[in-house]
Swiss-Prot record:
It is found in: Cytoplasm. It comes from Mycobacterium sp. (strain KMS). NCBIfam families: ackA. It catalyses: acetate + ATP = acetyl phosphate + ADP. Catalyzes the formation of acetyl phosphate from acetate and ATP. Can also catalyze the reverse reaction. Homodimer. The keyword Transferase applies. The gene is ackA. This is Acetate kinase.
């Protein structure tokens, strides 16, 4: 029987799940439970030609898992009869010691719980998903795959913050980096697409989704990345601020009377594109820029301009770090689907060897494609990410 792996990605109010054949790369089923804990919860699963949906309240992540399993049964893909060999779990933060794909036991779950302060939006729901899945599949191996793994061996100068060294060492403060599974996957896919050795390429990878990060990759090894100790640093994101002067936080604490928890919530949930423009969906943002009332238009335009400004700064910095860049890769929801973001991120960079083909950039596609001009010294690609497949393949290597 063909081997399959169930991959779970637990968010604060959602559970994404996918059933894959790691050997062939085929996705057998793909689903999501959204708005967990709210009255308007919804769940859907696409399995082959069949789509199953539910709209019933899902109070917690354990209930979300039961809902997911029910969707599989309803779609005729009972998990007990599809050759399931492992359950893979995306875990955002593994701290200083956890970075290789790791078999999950009770001690590991306790460790992941202790790391919640490093990824308060991501690690707690991941632990809930792990606990629920281990109850549902007690006889299967469960594997944690860490977002931070790919960046574990960053150059010391890139990983080190210029703060008191004793404090850094005592509290394991360093640049960990995130979206590593995605950055590694698409950089490898870029080499395959171009039919050249990965070791020969210098790349800038731009993972632009609700969370967003950039990386500079030389010869298949990352030499810098935009996210840091936590997933808050770097690019402007859907609800996260990205880079911000630490003095702003001290000022808000001292002068505005905000607590540490309030500041953290503001940075994580009420900043970024939402904080400036009141919206995280770039499709809506573009609509407001084009046809909103004056206030909506100004706010949306400011959010977009700040987003692009920060993105261009990182591209420029990574061009300088790499010296020259063979490939720039856009991936994730915004990176794969928003032609305007890609255009504006790279506009005016012809002297740096980066030229887009306007027609190719505007042409939608769900497969890897080149969008740079034939005359462009730097190749620009759009490559769909597939973190779930990468996680599934990591699982079978461990078990």
């Amino acid at each position: 029987m063909t081997r399959t792996v169930l991959v779970l990605n637990s968010g604060s109010s959602s559970l994404k799940f996918q059933l894959l054949e790691p050997d062939s790369g085929a996705s057998l089923a793909d689903g999501i439970v959204e708005r967990i804990g709210e009255d308007s919860s919804s769940a859907s699963l696409v399995c082959g030609e069949r789509e199953v949906t539910h709209s019933e309240r899902v109070p917690d992540h354990e209930a979300a898992l039961r809902t997911a399993y029910g969707l599989f049964d309803e779609a005729g893909a009972e998990l007990g009869s599809v050759g399931l060999v492992a359950v893979g779990h995306r875990v955002v933060h593994g701290g200083p010691d956890l970075y290789q794909p790791t078999l999950i036991d009770d001690a590991l779950v306790d460790t992941l719980e202790s790391l919640a302060p490093l990824a308060p939006l991501h690690n707690p729901p991941a632990v809930l998903g792990i606990r629920g899945a281990r109850k549902a599949f007690p006889d299967l191996p469960h594997v944690a795959v860490f977002d931070t793994a790919y960046f574990h061996d960053l150059p010391v100068a890139a990983a080190t913050y210029a703060i008191d060294r004793d404090l850094s060492e005592q509290w394991h403060i360093r640049r960990y980096g995130f979206h590593g599974t995605s950055h590694q996957y698409v950089s490898e896919q870029a080499a395959l697409f171009l039919d050249v050795p990965l070791s020969s390429l210098s790349q800038i990878v731009l993972h632009l989704g609700n969370g967003a990060s950039a990386s500079a990759i030389l010869g298949g090894r990352p030499i810098d990345t935009s996210m840091g100790l936590t997933p808050m640093e770097g690019l402007v994101m859907g609800t996260r601020s990205g880079d911000v002067d630490p003095g702003v936080l001290v000022y808000l604490w001292r002068t505005a009377g905000m607590s540490v928890d309030e500041i953290e919530t503001m940075l994580n949930k009420r900043s970024g594109v939402r904080g400036l423009g009141g919206e995280i969906d770039f499709r809506v943002l573009h609509q407001r820029i084009e046809s909103g009332d004056e206030s909506d238009r100004e706010n949306a335009q400011l959010a977009y301009d700040v987003y692009i400004h920060r993105l261009r700064k990182y591209i420029g910095a990574y061009l300088a770090l790499l010296g020259s860049t063979d490939v720039i890769v856009f991936t994730a929801g915004v990176g794969e689907n928003d032609a305007a973001v890609r255009r504006d991120a790279l506009s005016g960079m012809g002297r740096l060897g980066i030229e887009l083909d306007e027609h190719l950039n505007e042409s939608p596609s769900h497969t890897a494609r080149r969008i740079s001009a034939e005359t462009s010294p730097t190749t620009v690609l759009v490559i769909p990410t597939n973190e779930e497949l990468a996680i599934a393949r990591a699982c079978v290597e461990v078990i």
